[in-house]
């Protein structure tokens, strides 16, 4: 985990705090982005203890759905996360075909 970028650590910590471990507890990148932008105690996660408060705030402010998806794809390639086949999910009244992800 030490080799991960601070941004990847934020995304991993969000998955962990949401309880997205194992295929029965998967979540979408949209839910992760919402969790990151709305959760005040995310910085208290053990993985983020060494990230300075200013760096943490900068990371949170720069996060968007594209960056979250890119970071999740990187975590999947490293074998840390797992993705599902796309499923049809309604988000904000719009039906989308999305993958769900979870920590292995």
Residue ranges and their predicted role:
Residues 15, 36, 51, 55, ...:
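Hydrophobic, Leu/Ile/Phe/Ala-enriched alpha-helical segments that form helix-helix packing faces
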Residues 27-58:
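DNA-recognition alpha helix
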Residues 86-104:
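Short, cationic-aromatic polyanion-contact patches
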Residues 59-77:
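Short amphipathic alpha-helical interaction segments
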Residues 7, 25-28, 52, 64-68:
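Short, conserved alpha-helical segments within structured domains
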Residues 1-38:
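Short alpha-helical segments that sit at the start of domains
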Residues 76-88:
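A short, conserved structural fragment
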């Amino acid at each position: 985990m030490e080799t991960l970028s601070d941004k990847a650590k934020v995304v991993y910590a969000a998955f962990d705090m949401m309880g997205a471990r194992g295929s029965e507890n998967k979540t979408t990148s949209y839910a992760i982005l919402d969790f990151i932008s709305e959760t005040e105690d995310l910085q208290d996660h053990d993985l983020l203890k060494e990230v300075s408060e200013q760096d943490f705030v900068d990371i949170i402010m720069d996060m968007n759905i594209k960056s979250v998806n890119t970071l999740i794809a990187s975590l999947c390639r490293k074998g840390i996360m797992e993705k599902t086949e796309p499923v049809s999910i309604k988000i904000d009244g719009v039906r989308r075909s999305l993958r769900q992800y979870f920590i292995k």
